[in-house]
């Protein structure tokens, strides 16, 4: 027996390769939340722009195709910085809570790709979230950013 997925609760970048849907422009932002309340307020404002996995056609003139897509991913330290309750944080699998550095040998990040060679931004849990914006053209990308 299979379950029906609630596509509204799944971010679009999980199910769609935006490049093949006509979004050749992209910008990636790394975020840090220094104040939990301000971070949560930022996310409350951002949520209206998050692209879900709900169906839309790839055709350029599709009426429900968004002009831009926006998605976000969090690190464990990012969820901690947002003051997510410990009870909730404990529910995440160790693969996520350990982080990429602790799992580098499993991920193939060895030799020149090992954690000690990563850019400084990746040291010490400083990245709390990754924001991706895809657009049909540069003007649309700049207007969303």
Give, region by region, the residue ranges found by the protein language model.
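Long, low-complexity, Ser/Thr/Gly/Pro-rich intrinsically disordered segments that act as flexible linkers
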Residues: 1-145
